[in-house]
Every structure is written in structure tokens, then in C-alpha cells.
Amino acid sequence: MADKGNFNNIRQLCLRLRPILGVRMDQIYAAYLAEDPDGREQIEHYLELLAAKHIPQSLGQEEAELIPPSQEQAQGEYPLGQVLYSGKHLYPFGLRENEWIQHMAILGRSGSGKTNIGFSILKTLVQHDKPFLVFDWKRNYRDLLAWPEFHVVEVYTIGRSIAPLTFNPLIPPTGTDPKTWLKKLNEVIAHAYCLGNGVLYLLQQAVDAVYEEAGVYDNLVQSWPTFKDVLTKARTMDTRGREAGWLSSTLRALSSLCFGGMGDLLNSSSNRSIDHILDGNVILELDGLSQADKTFFVQACLLYLHHKKMAENVREHFDRCILIEEAHHILSGQRTSLTGAESVMDTTYREIREFGVSLVLLDQMPSKLSGFALANSYATICMSMSNRADINAMSQTLLLDTGKDVLGTLEVGQAVVKLQGRIPRPFLISIPEFRIEKGRVTDEQIRDYMKDKMPQLGTEDGVSDGTVGEEQEPMEKGDGGPGNALEIAFLKDVVDNPDSGVAARYKRLGLSGRQGQKLKTGLLDQGLIEEQLGTTQAGRLMTIRLTEQGRQLLLNPGE
């Protein structure tokens, strides 16, 4: 009886040669199985010659184990790089539409090329008209404005006055119960500022009292409370014994939320600004904040978006992408183990996919990332690693039993990819350089560029109708009836620009992303337009077409 181990070795050799020689290797392996011992020995010698000819001797055992997918398996509408094997670029690799909402993790040491692939991801998202939000920790992404296709992007300098933003996390998103929001927001504060259960208790008491006084629970809000109000309330709390120590930590955290740029950011009575950025292509520069403040702001934004999307009807259809740098601060494995349970951010990461949101994590220390985050990432892209703990963490995630040492030998721009779906084995890709002049875009250029793009925040009275979490919407143009002027203009634009993306269409019509989305939804509900997945020069895009009813209305707008 033939040695079973020898059969496995021959099978592995055929698999390694198949990407180079194609289906011919399937035929050779089938012949090997059918031959007698002498015939198998001849085939073994032949395979060794083929391997010597086509697989370079410099190709390490670990790299040789990274067997590439077929060209058909590697194809995707959103190209990320070239499949690399035996020192050769074989064919493009890309993600597919339905894979984005299952999330992506891009991991590698500093300088390995993570930001480069981040640039490429944003470019392909713009080409497919998919909105994105970038949490930029080191002011890396503003230079994309030098590219014409990124002129639809807005850049905000969080905590700095160049292009400021306001966001009051105490205002719950539409449809969210204030008490539910209070508890989740307090957990986010505790994570960011390393607070214990005693401080959580006092925070809950303070925010609850402020909500009660402002009429939040009774839908009678005239002016939304801010963290300054919570700080004032906390200072008047009567505490004794251990609670006095808890109060000291509570005041420390609340003071951070009310000081300097963080105070300007958070202490607003309106959320028009944050609602605006969640509907477009936006880069948020966070270098003006401390590490703890960055963590709180990012987590609060993600929590707000999660609950905001819950109130919408989009389910499991790729709607937008969020790119998060330094992700271990947001999804911390250490914090998860301290609480002994899934954190609010872990829950958000796991659930937000249902609402059409793709999260892309970038980090250099996967060993510090939450296990929930790594376990719930469909695509893992691992670039060069230098730390043994990180290499071990990634070898487990990538299911590299014997080839983990390759993670320490990857060149800049190379990565090992593992998908939890169409391609069963990890494989190697090469990511092209995104040529960009770093440091080209200055603060003054950002100020001038953004002066007409920043949302009008209105007066400080914020929500004045007494509705909890109700979003304030500017009045639409036209008379508000069927076939009004704005609807007719939208229908005409569909005829004149049939393959246009929604961002460009809204810009031509002078609409914000929110206003345009509302108008489009109304036309869909009336049966005047329909969405179709079609192929354009930019690739496969969701396009808008008039229905017969829409064409009739355009021909006879007065009827």
C-alpha cells in the first residue's frame, strides 16, 4: 500500500504548481493516483523537475505554502492589489460588493504600507460612489484633496479651529430611548478614560438628573443639555466615603470633556453638524485631541451612527464605509478582558454590518485588538510584522500553522490575505504604490477649501420642538406636493446624466447628502424612479433610471 504521507506531499506539490501551470496539474495528479508504484515514481521525478523549473529556489517554504486562488476566485469589483506567487504578479485581487459589510482588518508594523492601501480603498470607493468616513489620527489623508476625484471630500480638524465640527453625544439619535442611550454612552466614557464601576454609577446619576431637568424623558426639550451641565451637576453631588473617591474620578473625566478643543467640540446644543458628516465623504483629523479624547470621540460617533442606522430601512446592503486608524484604542482586547464581557464597541462592530456599514480597521498591534473584532472581520490583510506577539496573533487569525515566519519577511507593499469565504486558504498579494505628495495640503488650504462646505449649525437653541433625538432638516425647495420643482429637476438630471453617482448628482442639484437621500427615497416611494446595478466606465455601479410613471410626469409636469 502506498505511503499516505507521500500522496499528501505530491498533492501539495501539485497545488503549488497549479497557479503556474493551470489545469494540467489536475490531470497529472489524476494520472498519479491511477498509476502503479513504478509509474508514480516516474511522475514524482517529473514533478520535481517542474518544481525546480517554475518555483524559484529562493522561495521559502513558508511563502510556498501561500497557494494563490484561481483568477476567477480572485476577481472582485473593488481592486486592492495583484495576486503574487513565485515572484510573479498573476492577476488582480479585489473585494466584492457583498463582502464589504462583513468588515476588514489591515494590520502591519509602522511603515509596512497600511496607509497606502487605505488610500487605494478610498479611491475605489469614490469610483463606486460609496460614501466613506475616515478617522485620521495622524493627518495622513488630507493630501488626497490634490487628486481631482477627491474634490467631493470634506476635511474637518477635530479640536482645532481650522475646519471645526460640533457633536453633542448627549443628544440621542432618532428613535433611541434616552435611558438606553445614557447607559451605552457612559460605558464609552468609562472605556476612554479608564473609569471603574463606581464612577459609572455617579455618571449615570448625574446625566439622569440633567436629562430629567431638561425634559428629555417627557419629550419637552427646549435646549439640549451638554457635558458642562453634567459637570455642574456632578460638582453638587453629596458623596461620602468611597463615593468621594469615585466623584474625584468622575470630575476628572467630565473636566476633560469640557476643556479646550474637546469642550468646543462637544458642548453644543445641536447635532446638525454630525448628522451632516455621516451622509457624505468625510475625513476627520483627530491630531488636535489627546489619546483618551480621540478614543471617546470615535467610539461616540460609531455608537451614534449605529443607533441612527437602526432607524433606517437599509439592511445588509453595502451603504457606506468607515476607516479607523489605531483601531486597538477603539476595540481593545485588554478592556474586554477587564470587564469580562463584550463591550459596547464590540457589539457595535458585530451588529453594524446589518445596517449596510463596512468597518475597515488599520492597526500595527493586532495582539492588542479585541478578539471579537478579529473574529468578526471577513477580510484580514496582514502586512509585515516585527513583534513576536503580533506574529503569533496573526498566524492564528490567518490559520498559518507552519508558515507564520513569512509575516516577518514581507516587503513593503506585500500582504498575506485571508478571506472567511470564497478563498479557503491565505495567499500573498502585492499592493501598488499610491503616489501622493505628503504634506502638500496646508491648514490654510483646508480653511479656504472648507469655508463654503461646513454645515450651517444654526443657533444654539438646537432642537426646539421637544422631540427626543429628532433630526433638524432644512426646508426642501418647491411647494412640497407631487411633482414639485425639485423632483422635476431630479428627474431631468437622471435623464441628462444616467450614469452619474449620487454624490455628483446631489452636488449639481445643490443638495446636501441628507437632502438628496430624502428626495431620492421619496421618488422611489412614489414609483417615479428605480435603482439598477449596472456596468459603467468606472465599474459596476448602482444607477438610477426613470420608471414609465416618472417619464410621464417629466413629459407632463403640470398634470
Question: Where is each model-derived feature located?
Answer:
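Conserved P-loop NTPase motor module
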Residues: 1-21, 25-32, 36, 216, ...
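Basic- and hydrophobic-enriched, low-structure N-terminal and domain-boundary segments
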Residues: 1-109, 116-117, 121, 162, ...
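P-loop NTPase motor domains
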Residues: 120-350, 354-357, 411, 415-423
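Conserved ATP-driven motor cores of ASCE-family P-loop NTPases powering translocation/secretion/packaging/pilus
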Residues: 120-124, 171-174, 340-433
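Short, Lys/Arg-rich nucleic-acid/phosphate-binding segment
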Residues: 533-543
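Basic, amphipathic "hinge/linker" alpha-helix immediately C-terminal to the N-terminal HTH DNA-binding motif
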Residues: 543-554
